[in-house]
Amino acid sequence: MNAVYIEITNVCNLNCSFCPCGKRNSSVPPDSQASTIPPQNSAPKEPREFMSSELFELCIAEAATVAENVYFHVLGEPTLHPGFGHFLKKLEATPLKLNLTTNGTTIARVSERLLECPAVRQVNFSTHAYAELPREPALTYLQDILDFCKMANAVRPDLYINLRLWNVGDDSSDAWNRTMLAKVGEAFGSNIELGHFCSRHKSFNVTGRIYLHQDSRFEWPSASSTTERLPVTSSPTERSDGGDPSITSTNYSVWIPSGQSPSRMTAAGTCRALDTHVAILHDGRVVACCLDHSGQITLGKITDQSLAEILDSPTATNLREGFKKHELRHPFCQSCSFCKRFGK
């Protein structure tokens, strides 16, 4: 397995329309920068939390047994965690490498810590988020990112940096995308245009190990309105609906269509979840993929079992076998558009 996604917080300081964080009100710590984007709707507030240091240390210890890399997000902006610098230090004591994905709004505050940490392998900046910001703060944040890139080139030339524009094809973002590319060109002498993007050519070298990564926008998967959560069973063979017993684990139920066996309700497709990666939410729940922010395919809890045991659970095995056979056996997977990228 390549990576474990560890959601150190589900707090974010932006309310992007394309992200589940932006579809409900969120709280941010007092010292964080407030969002300049108003909430997109009036959905009820859901808990926003920060992973404890004890849980984080357990997560990286378990991650080191199955993977080489970690991310610090599922939802949320990881650099907002009050213990972000402390977590970097803890990570240095393991063989794990960090691929950090950030919206970049706080990069000026954490840049020194990142560049001094040998465990940081790659930094991904979601610059497409700025298309929804007023021009002035967007340009300020972008300049902070470009300044970081220049510093990294000087002191950490081994550090990979991706400047992401994952909104290609979204006409409302074109103006920002052109502005962003022009600013990158001014900073590094590159000449990359929007028209250069195609589904098989998404990454463009800017300079050194700095890349522009373009892609289309995707919709986050969600549970089907026809699904319901099974009651927790005492053993994987107890299923009141007569369905495939391997789809539930001993202690955790999953979402399945009402009255249907998951093994009979499949759709064509595959995913890299449980092959290249797995995710741990801020409360310790282990989920099948990096997009399952609400724990709809909860495989277990890292405080109850080892990560290796959870990955070997009946539910994980069932899903993994399905992916190998190009079967999406879970409604959450069937509602996911991200997996369509794998065939491009």
Tell me what each language-model feature is.
Residues I6, N10-N13, M265, E327-H330:
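Processing junctions and N-termini across compartments
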Residues M1, R48, S263, R272, ...:
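Residue-level marker of regulatory loop/turn positions in helix-turn-helix DNA-binding domains and
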Residues M1-Y5, G22, D31-P39, R285-K344:
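Flexible mid-to-C-terminal extensions adjoining Fe-S/redox cofactors in radical SAM and related proteins
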Residues V28-Q33, T94, C117-Q305, I310:
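Radical SAM enzyme [4Fe-4S]-AdoMet core and its adjacent flexible, acidic
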Residues N13, S17-P20, R272, Q334-S337:
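Cys/His/Pro-rich metal-binding microdomains
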Residues R24, E68, L96, T276, ...:
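Generic structural signal for secondary-structure transition and capping sites
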Residues M1-Q122, E132-Q143:
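Conserved alpha-helical substructure of the radical SAM core
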